[in-house]
């Protein structure tokens, strides 16, 4: 009798809930050891003299479902002491491609005369 009650009450068929989470976006930059970082420091000191720029990929990732369309990202880029076009260039559009949940936004840092003696900072904000 106990076995019959256990078998009778053990099954409850339900449809699982679908994944749902609020949509969001964040920087997902990691070191080679998979440690999350929010700041990157680069130097031209160890680069050959003929290296005139360094391309820095900034990984941007979404939270939530992928979309069937490209989605522009409201990315703010600014600097207190670096000038776009002179000290750096923004090479890729700030757009999450259709059917993707992440992309690399590339910032090109230029080797200028000023960078030899002065620290330049560029800030990115979502």
Region locations from a protein language model:
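C-terminal motif of bacterial Sec signal peptides marking the signal peptidase cleavage site
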Residues: 6-10
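Short, hydrophobic beta-strand segments
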Residues: 97-101, 105-113
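Sec-dependent signal peptide recognition
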Residues: 1-2
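Enriched for extracellular/lumenal, surface-exposed ectodomains of secreted and cell-surface proteins
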Residues: 124-126
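Acidic/polar, low-complexity intrinsically disordered N-terminal segments immediately downstream
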Residues: 12-85
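Short glycine/proline/serine/threonine-rich loop/turn segments at secondary-structure transition edges
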Residues: 113-121
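Short beta-strand and strand-turn-strand segments in soluble, beta-rich domains
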Residues: 78-94, 101
């Amino acid at each position: 009798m106990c076995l019959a009650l256990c078998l009778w009450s053990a099954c409850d068929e339900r449809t699982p809930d679908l994944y749902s989470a609020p949509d969001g976006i964040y920087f997902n930059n990691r070191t080679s050891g998979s440690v999350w970082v929010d700041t990157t420091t680069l130097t031209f000191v160890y680069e050959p003299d003929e290296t005139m720029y360094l391309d820095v990929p900034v990984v941007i990732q979404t939270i939530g479902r992928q979309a069937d369309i490209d989605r522009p990202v409201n990315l703010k880029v600014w600097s207190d002491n670096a000038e776009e076009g002179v000290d750096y260039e923004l090479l890729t559009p700030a757009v999450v491609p259709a059917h993707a949940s992440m992309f690399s936004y590339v910032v090109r840092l230029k080797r200028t005369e000023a960078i030899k003696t002065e620290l330049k900072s560029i800030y990115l904000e979502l």
